[in-house]
Swiss-Prot record:
Superkingdom: Archaea
Family (UniProt): Belongs to the UPF0200 family.
Positions annotated to bind ATP: 7-14
UniProt entry tagged with the keyword Nucleotide-binding: yes
Protein name as catalogued: UPF0200 protein PH1008
Protein keywords: ATP-binding, Nucleotide-binding
Pfam families: AAA_17 (PF13207)
InterPro entries: NTP_hydrolase-rel, P-loop_NTPase
Keyword Aminoacyl-tRNA synthetase set for record: no
GO terms of molecular function: ATP binding
């Protein structure tokens, strides 16, 4: 089973990924694939550098590029464990790459939705090097994400978690959905 996590930056994908990890399920981050690629190419992991790398790999490999970069890792995990979570899918082309490559596996899309102002505050507190520092940077990043087709992927979701609540309430929602998904595996 392949579980694709989709959500705008700061929506809570990382918390959902932690819930799967606590159950011993491996998680691969699409964002890490871009950060690793930036490192390989000697490009700084700044918002501009990561944007450049993400656009460059898509130019070189097509719109499903980031999925293509992660497929070898996913293949190995599926062989060993039979289940993997892929955090940060952004485009319908990436979904298609996973479905094409793993046509014998069940592929589930789990979307996490959270309001923009809430996400902006979370990202400011998180403070990762590629996180936006200003509201305009945040809006630019959202525009880029939406340009990749993240909204389309969210509309294809098999499950949706709305993260507009307290942390504890969000944790309860996560546990409920994760349990439901895993009840169908293997």
């Amino acid at each position: 089973m392949i579980i694709l996590l989709v959500g705008m930056p700061g929506s809570g994908k990382g918390e959902v990924a932690k819930a799967f990890r606590r159950r011993g399920i491996p998680v691969i981050s699409m964002g890490d694939a871009i950060r690793e690629e930036a490192e390989k190419r000697g490009i700084p992991k700044t918002p501009e550098g990561l944007k450049y790398v993400s656009l460059k790999v898509r130019e070189e490999l097509g719109p499903g590029a980031v999925a293509i970069l992660t497929i070898p890792k996913v293949r190995g995990i599926i062989k060993r464990k039979g289940i993997v979570v892929i955090e940060g899918v952004r485009s319908p082309a990436e979904v298609q790459e996973f479905r094409r490559e793993f046509k014998n596996e069940r592929v589930i899309i789990l979307a996490i939705h959270s309001p923009p102002k809430v996400r902006f505050e979370r990202l400011r507190r998180r403070g990762r090097s590629d996180d936006p520092k200003t509201w305009n940077e945040f809006l630019d990043r959202d525009k880029k994400e939406l340009g990749f087709g993240i909204g389309e992927v969210m509309s294809l979701a098999d499950y949706v978690i709305l993260n507009n609540c307290t942390f504890n309430e969000f944790q309860r929602k996560i546990e409920k959905v994760v349990s439901k998904i895993l009840s169908n595996w293997p």
